[in-house]
UniProtKB/Swiss-Prot annotation:
NCBIfam families in UniProt: ATPsyn_F1gamma, PRK05621.1-1
Keyword Kinase: no
Keyword Ribonucleoprotein: no
CDD domains: F1-ATPase_gamma
PANTHER family: ATP SYNTHASE GAMMA CHAIN (PTHR11693), ATP SYNTHASE SUBUNIT GAMMA, MITOCHONDRIAL (PTHR11693:SF22)
Organism of this sequence: Herminiimonas arsenicoxydans
Lineage: Bacteria, Pseudomonadati, Pseudomonadota, Betaproteobacteria, Burkholderiales
This protein's name: ATP synthase gamma chain
Family stated for the protein in its record: Belongs to the ATPase gamma chain family.
Membrane topology recorded in Swiss-Prot or TrEMBL: Peripheral membrane protein
Gene: atpG
Length: 289
């Protein structure tokens, strides 16, 4: 059995760890609230752009933007994979990358090639380890994502799709459901879902006056719409990250408390055994005199 001094050292070590995890839990909780606010604030923007794009597409059926055209010529699929820059957020990244691995194997079995864009250090490291083709990446996004940091890597994928080098583009991220639940998602980014746009357009009974013309507006608008979808994915992923980290650190703090309780029990038993032994020796010595 370990000595009392060794057990006290272990208790002190676990208590120090608990202080760290508790502080990280509080920081994550604060960041989570801010991330949720940004996530909710971004939704009306992307929703409004989708409504206008839907109206434009329906009002000008003679023009079809490349983002709405399905293709199966290049036999190459693009992925924009959104992960975190840091760890200590439970199995969040693992769950997202697991569905990426499954999809990559499926496409490989179909004889298709894959090109990827990594947003976040964890995803970039994973893609490099498995030998995937990474055409661009963005890391160190920080707690406040900016479109300026994302637009470069995203544009690589958009240009490749417009040039016919990609048949489809998917985005992978972790969707924020609530504080305790986050789900890994894989959504088709391109070609845009024409049915969804049509459904939005059917609910609108008005039209705009477009300057200089509808085609120019829709060309620019659909690019902005796709960028908004990517930004929304990053915002959702960030909110999920802080929620997962808060839960993970709370679990770590609770586990540390349990370990401290068990160690204190062992320490008390050891101390009691030592006292009993000393008393026995004193009594035996007194009896021998």
């Amino acid at each position: 059995m370990a000595s009392g001094k060794e057990i006290r050292g272990k208790i002190k070590s676990v208590e120090n760890t608990k202080k760290i995890t508790k502080a990280m839990e509080m920081v994550a909780a604060s960041k989570m609230r801010k991330a949720q606010e940004r996530m909710h604030a971004a939704r009306p923007y992307s929703d409004k752009i989708r409504n206008i794009a839907a109206n434009l597409s329906q009002a000008n059926p003679e023009y079809t933007h490349p983002f709405l055209v399905k293709s199966d010529v290049s036999k190459t699929v693009g992925f924009i994979i959104v992960t975190t820059d840091k760890g200590l957020c439970g199995g969040m990244n693992t769950n997202s990358l697991r569905i990426v691995t499954t999809k990559l194997r499926e496409l490989e079995a179909q004889g298709k090639k894959v090109e990827t864009v990594a947003i976040g250090n964890k995803g970039l490291g994973f893609l490099n380890r498995i030998g995937a083709r990474v055409v661009s990446h963005a890391v160190q996004i920080g707690d406040t994502p900016h479109l300026d940091k994302l637009i470069g890597p995203v544009k690589v994928m958009l240009d490749a799709y417009q040039d016919g080098k990609l048949d489809a583009v998917y985005v992978v991220y972790t969707k924020f459901i609530n504080t305790m639940k986050q789900e890994p998602m894989m959504e088709q980014l391109l070609p845009l879902a024409a049915d969804a746009l049509k459904a939005d357009a059917d609910s609108l009974a008005w039209d705009y006056i477009y300057e200089p013309d509808a085609q120019t507006v829709i060309d620019e608008l659909l690019i902005r719409y796709v960028e908004a979808l990517i930004f929304q994915s990053v915002a959702e992923n960030l909110a999920s990250e802080q929620s997962a980290r808060m839960v993970a650190m709370k679990s770590a703090s609770d586990n540390a408390g349990s370990v401290i309780g068990e160690l204190k029990l062992v320490y008390n038993k050891t101390r009691q055994a030592a006292i009993t032994k000393e008393l026995s020796e004193i009594v035996a010595g007194a009896a021998a005199v």
